[in-house]
Amino acid sequence: MQRSLSRTPPIAVSLADDESSERVARISLKHEQTRTNNYRSTTSTMSTLPSLLVVTSLLAFSNVFKCFHVFARDVDYCFADEDDPYLYMATKTAYHFVHGGKTRFQTVPNCRPVQMWMLATYGTRCPTLEEINMINSLTDIRDQILHNHETRGVGHMCNRDLDNLKRWQPDEYLKPHRAEALTPQGVEDMKLLARRLQSNFPELLQPFTSNISSSNYKFRANEAQRSMESFMEGLFGSRNAVVPEESFLNDTLLNAYKTCGVWENDEHQQSYENTEYDLFVVGPIFQNLVHNVSRRLGFLYNISSDRINAMYEACRYEKAWTVITLSPWCAVFNKEELRILEYREDLNYYYKAGYGREINARLGCPLLHDMMQHFWNIAHDETSNEPMGIFYFSDIVSLQNLLTTMGINEDQTPLTAFTYKDMAKRQWRTSLISSFAANLIAVFYKCNDSKDNNKVMFYLAEKPVQYDGCLVGLCDWEFLKSKFGQLASNCKLDVCWIESGAPANLLLNSIAIHFVCFILVLLGY
């Protein structure tokens, strides 16, 4: 700090000449007056010095506080201290947070359950191999984030969040050989689901040991074998209690979409499925998310969407694996950003497997037909050889196809890239309809009702489905027959091959090639 206490430089006076003594006297007097004035100025300055020091100290402390405040995290909150974290992580949501089994299923007066039909997805599992590689690569950006905060003094994460991130190491579930394997939480998901169902429907699911057989309980799984076994163990105490039906690679019941050329064709998906998703990703809402996350982590440029995706995958997988702890990577996002990421995935599946494409409603038809056929048999003859429980295990696309066919959780307004703010209360939320261990359960009842003694109750994630035309979720069988009967009895998947697009062209090209070859053979070539 410069101070106004510097002395007046000495005045050079030459006495070599023969100037008069009067001039010398005048100069000496002027010099003395200057010194006197400087002394007075110095005295005045010294008298105000304590006040100046106080003000200067306050300013310096303020600057230090500002620097410290920025380092501590100049954002809304510290995630490590969050008492109410956002738990809805789209298709990677832990079933523990969304199922309705915390309360008992409602009792249907004057009715008894006679059959249960269920389609469930796999429980909490490890990432795919591609996702494992993506999450494991986060160690590099983690080190950059720490460097940004600790060395460069930029970034806005709080110290506790940084400490948690510093201690983070890739989990054992991120080993390549564990790809898509069921985790202990996934095993628990399925066991507890089975036990809750058994507790709510003892007439169906608490049989004598001699009645536990494949004729009374039908099991079938495709790509969810261990989930099925865990459910069976929770139900009957053994993973091998019932011999399941064999499932084939091209299973048109449990995975109809995988046998559909039009659905899988990249060009067809690009034209229908990805347009709204891509528009949302390049739009202002998502790009603002990328910008804010990048600055929060201390980057002066926008990090790539791949990095955003990797951090989001780490956040939601780790939360699903261990429901009682928080993932350090969730601290990267605030609640609104997690809602945006959730909507992005909802948008993707809306067109991939839901109401965004007409073909998806066709692909859920085989499962609807199977359910209706079982109920039809038992409605006409309760003494038929129908099993008491039918339990299928597949993936979220097949479940979403079935929900679409049945019109469950359909919004009046389609989801688009531009409706995020308008669809906060949307029905199509993958967090709630297709989390880990998601399920649709239908229970057929025989009732003492003069009007219709056959009724059906639907449960989605163990919560009653509120169907128009049904009473608090309880549907008359005659109503369901009129609603689904014609559709379920006419499940044609020829749409997968005759619809315009690459698969149809491929078929025509194949016929043309075979015809040309046939002609060449006839001509002797």
Predicted regions and their residues:
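Compositionally biased, intrinsically disordered low-complexity segments enriched in Pro/Arg/Gln/His
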Residues: 31-33
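N-terminal signal peptide
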Residues: 57-82, 519-525
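C-terminal GPI-anchoring signal of eukaryotic secretory precursors
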Residues: 43, 496-513
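Acidic, serine-rich low-complexity intrinsically disordered regions
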Residues: 15, 20-21
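Transmembrane alpha-helices of multi-pass eukaryotic membrane proteins
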Residues: 51, 115, 217-220, 392, ...
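Signature for phosphate-centric chemistry
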Residues: 67-501
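A positional/structural detector of protein chain ends, strongest at the extreme C-terminus
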Residues: 1-3, 48, 521-525
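Phospho-regulated RS/SR low-complexity segments
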Residues: 4-8
